């Protein structure tokens, strides 16, 4: 920790921003004094369809959110690079992020990084609270 300041790091793709993203970031921000967000690089998104919105635009959108103090693009080669550079006290994962908390904490410790991992399990109850749902609705109604 930086004195009494707690830095929280949230990560994600943030493709087609929606209320679910906002809830995740609001809950993440509430855990500390500063929220830094790592936006996934286009090339690194392999666990789901590639983002519709390019990484530079996703970064710009996330940076503009009032609860976000800083947003950066992730590393192309090493997911731990931004963690080493920004030294968060807490790393949050969204309810649907595929990363296992125990594995992540173990990997952080191996690298001498002491951030605590917190899963934000709350979900926003809305019809279009995922980028996939938004894309599917657009395809259904507009194509």
Swiss-Prot record:
SUPFAM superfamilies: Nucleotidylyl transferase. The keyword Heme does not apply. Its cofactor is a divalent metal cation. It is an enzyme of class 2 (transferase). GO terms for biological process: FAD biosynthetic process; FMN metabolic process. Keywords: ATP-binding, FAD, Flavoprotein, FMN, Nucleotide-binding, Nucleotidyltransferase, Transferase. The keyword Mitochondrion does not apply. One of its GO terms (molecular function) is FMN adenylyltransferase activity. It holds the Pfam family CTP_transf_like. ATP binds at residues 13-14, 18-21, 96. It catalyses: FMN + ATP + H(+) = FAD + diphosphate. NCBIfam families: cyt_tran_rel. Catalyzes the transfer of the AMP portion of ATP to flavin mononucleotide (FMN) to produce flavin adenine dinucleotide (FAD) coenzyme. Homodimer. Belongs to the archaeal FAD synthase family. PANTHER family: FAD SYNTHASE. This is FAD synthase. The gene is ribL.
């Amino acid at each position: 920790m930086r004195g009494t300041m707690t830095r929280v790091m949230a990560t994600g793709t943030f493709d087609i921003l929606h209320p679910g993203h906002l809830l995740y970031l609001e809950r993440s921000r509430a855990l500390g004094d500063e929220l830094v967000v790592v936006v996934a690089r286009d090339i690194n998104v392999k666990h789901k369809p590639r983002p519709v919105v390019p990484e530079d635009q996703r970064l710009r959108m996330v940076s503009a959110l009032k609860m976000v103090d800083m947003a950066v693009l992730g590393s192309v080669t090493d997911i731990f690079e931004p963690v080493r550079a920004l030294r968060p006290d807490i790393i949050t994962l969204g309810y649907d992020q595929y990363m296992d908390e125990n594995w992540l904490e173990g990997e952080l410790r191996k690298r001498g990084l002491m951030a605590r991992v917190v899963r934000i399990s709350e979900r926003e109850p809305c019809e279009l609270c995922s980028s996939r749902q938004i894309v599917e609705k657009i395809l259904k109604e507009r194509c």
